[in-house]
Amino acid sequence: MVELQEKNGSVCIAVRAQPRSSKSMVSGEWNGALKVHLQSPPVDDAANEECCRLLARLFQVPPSRVHLVAGHSSRNKRVMVEGVSAAMATELLQPFLHT
C-alpha cells in the first residue's frame, strides 16, 4: 500500500520517480511508494516539476497545490497535495494499485 499521511487538509505521498522514461505516467506501487515514470531528465528540476504536474492532474487540483517537500535530488520523494484527504487520495490511486 502507498504510504499516505494526512495533515491540515493536505496529504503527503511517498513517490518513487523514474526519469527519462518513454512516457509520463503512474505505474503502480514500489516499496510503499507511488511509482511514477517521467519523460523529463533529472536536470534543472525538470523531472520534479513534471512529477508535480502529473500528480496535480491525477488528484484533480491546480499544479500550485502540489509541492515537493523532500527528495529534490533523489528518486525517492515526498509530495504534499493540498486540499486532498487521505481517503480521497486512496480512492483516486486505486486504479493504479495492484492489490
Swiss-Prot record:
Belongs to the UPF0235 family. SUPFAM superfamilies: YggU-like. It comes from Chlorobium chlorochromatii (strain CaD3). One of its GO terms (cellular component) is cytoplasm. PANTHER family: UPF0235 PROTEIN C15ORF40 (PTHR13420:SF7). Pfam families: DUF167 (PF02594). This is UPF0235 protein Cag_0319. SMART domains: DUF167. Signal peptide: none annotated. InterPro entries: DUF167, YggU-like_sf.
